[in-house]
């Protein structure tokens, strides 16, 4: 008999939204990880992915699954996900050693009806893109607020995150506004705890560019990517296989690329 907690009898958390996030993440792990045949797992960042790592840690402690999960190697997308991996007793490794990942889990800032994503609100978009595109299967977990009724840019109003080389940020801002007609293109600042721009793990800046509702994210991605000085764009195109949305009422919606 499995000692992994049954999702139907989980104790309540601090609020319904956290319950929803946990349920979405647990179901994503339960329904997608092939414990006997998969070994390299990508772990992203964000408040919902916390529960992905937690669920994998629960399987690690179950005698029925220990022999499999103890052989997993987990690839992080940043400092937060690195901590999640270690805190749950999972084995940490790097994409340098495992350039092909069996399955990756991450969150999203917004998801449209075609499973196109905006990501990068946490300023880890380059590493997130590297891990997700290196994965044979990419599964997204999020709460219902991240689900757009149609187009990207409907719910997520902070703009498309764009990682840029610091010496080119003025040029990129100019081109976003004047060539691609962004409504705004703002260098993300560090907030009250840090003077100056946010600096990514790769020592670059982030520009948040607002294009309003994005009806053709594929062409916008290509246009931004071609600008000199752009390192990576927070539009994840044709990448996600499934998205699990946790709802406030405790239910989970699943968008599947196959459907």
Swiss-Prot record:
**A Pfam family this protein belongs to?**
Rib_5-P_isom_A
GO CC terms on record? cytoplasm
Q: Name one GO biological process term.
A: pentose-phosphate shunt, non-oxidative branch
Q: Which InterPro entries match?
A: NagB/RpiA_transferase-like, Ribose5P_isomerase_type_A
List the EC numbers from the record: 5.3.1.6
The organism encoding this protein is Vanderwaltozyma polyspora (strain ATCC 22028 / DSM 70294 / BCRC 21397 / CBS 2163 / NBRC 10782 / NRRL Y-8283 / UCD 57-17) (Kluyveromyces polysporus)
List the catalytic activities from the record. aldehydo-D-ribose 5-phosphate = D-ribulose 5-phosphate
- Domain of life here? Eukaryota
Where does this protein reside within or beyond the cell?
Answer: Cytoplasm
Annotated family: Belongs to the ribose 5-phosphate isomerase family.
Q: Which GO terms describe its molecular function?
A: ribose-5-phosphate isomerase activity
Part of which pathway? Carbohydrate degradation; pentose phosphate pathway; D-ribose 5-phosphate from D-ribulose 5-phosphate (non-oxidative stage): step 1/1
Keyword Cytoplasm in the entry? The reply is yes
Which CDD domains does this chain map to?
RPI_A
Organism ancestry: Eukaryota, Fungi, Dikarya, Ascomycota, Saccharomycotina
Q: What is this protein called?
A: Ribose-5-phosphate isomerase
Provide this UniProt record's keywords sorted from A to Z: Cytoplasm, Isomerase
